[in-house]
Amino acid sequence: MSSIVIVSGSRTAMGGFQGSLSALTAPELGAAVIRESIQRAGVAPDQVDEVIFGCVLSAGIGQGPARQAMRKAGVPDHVGAVTINKLCGSAMKAVLMASDTLKAGSANIIVAGGMESMTNAPYILPKARGGYRMGHGEIKDHMFLDGLEDAETGRLMGSFAQDMANTKGFTREQMDNFAISSLKKAQTAITEGYFKDEIVPVEVKTRKGVEVIDQDEQPLKANLEKIPTLRPAFSKDGTITAANSSSISDGAAALVLTTEEYAQSHGLNTLAKIVATSTHSQHPSEFTIAPISAIQKVLERAGWSVDEVDAWEINEAFAMVAMAPIHELGIDEAKVNVHGGACALGHPIGATGSRIILSLIYALKRLGKKKGVAVLCIGGGEATAVAIEI
C-alpha cells in the first residue's frame, strides 16, 4: 500500500480574540489557506477530490462551512466538502479522515485542515423558538456552550485541567515557567522569521484601509513580567491562569494530502510522510492526560521509541497538558513546541490540529531533523496523534 504524504500546507497568522482577524468569518479564513495550499502543491483546483475541514463554532456561519470555504477558495463545484466537529481535535481528525480515504483508494488529492473564528461565535437564545412568555430569559454563549464546557456537567475545560494539575502535583511556578518558555520561543520564532514559510498573508479591511495580517498577533504583546501576578482562572486558590492556558483565537490551517505513488507520478514535492496515527478516549474529566496514551499508541504503530522522535508538537491547551506527557513518558522538553505553543500563539479550536502538524513539519525542516509527533487533547476525554517523517 502506498504511503500517505503531505505535499503542501499553509496557515493564517493566529489572531487574538477580537483582534487582527476579527473582521473575517471562519469560512473566509479557511478559504485563504485552502487556496494557498492548493497553489503551493502545484495542482489545479479541479484536481482536488474532496475538502475535509474542521470547524467547531459553526452556529450563525451558514450551511456547510467547509463547502463555503472551498468555494470561496475557487475550488470548483464538483468537488465535495465535509465539515468536521471533533472539538479541539477537529482539524487533526480531518487529516486522519483524509489519510484513511486516500488509503482506501477513494480519492487522489484531499485538502484537510480546520478554521475557527472564536471572536465571531454568536450568543444563543435557547427558548426563543417556543417563546419566553413572561419573566427573564437566558442567553447562552456559543463559544462556551459548544466549545469550552463539558456537555454533561457544564464545567469549563479549565476546571478539569486545574483538578489534574493538582493530582499531578504541578505547581503554579512550574506551569508559569512552561508558559513563559513557550512565549519566549514564539517571540524568537516571529522575530527571526521562522513562521514566514507557514503563513499566508490575509487582507483585512479596516477603517484606515486594507491591512495585511502576516504575523501572529499575541506573542509580541505579552508582558512576561505580569505572568506570575495573574489571578487564578478556575478556582479561588488555583494555579491555572490565563497565561498558562491557551488564549481564545482566530485562524485557519490547511494541508494537501495524496499518496506517495500519486505524488511521484505527477511530479509533486513531498513535505512529509504520515507514518502512523492514533486516537485515544477515556473519561471526559481526564481529557488533559489523554495525549499520553495517544502518544504511546502512535509510537507503537510507528515502531519508534520516545528518544527517536526529533521534535514534538503537544498542544498547550493548558501548560499542564504538555507537561504531563513530558513527565510521564520522559520526553526531552527541549524537543517540545520548539517555536512556542498555544500558550503563546493561541488556540483557534477548530484549526489547531492541522496548525500543529504544519508547524511541526517546518520546525523539522529548519532543524534538519526527520521524525516528529503532533498530539492534542480533546474535550470529552479524547486525544489524537500523528507521527510524521520528513
Regions found by a protein language model. Give the residues of each.
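Conserved active-site "lid/cap" helical segment
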Residues: M1-I61, P65-A69, A73, G80, ...
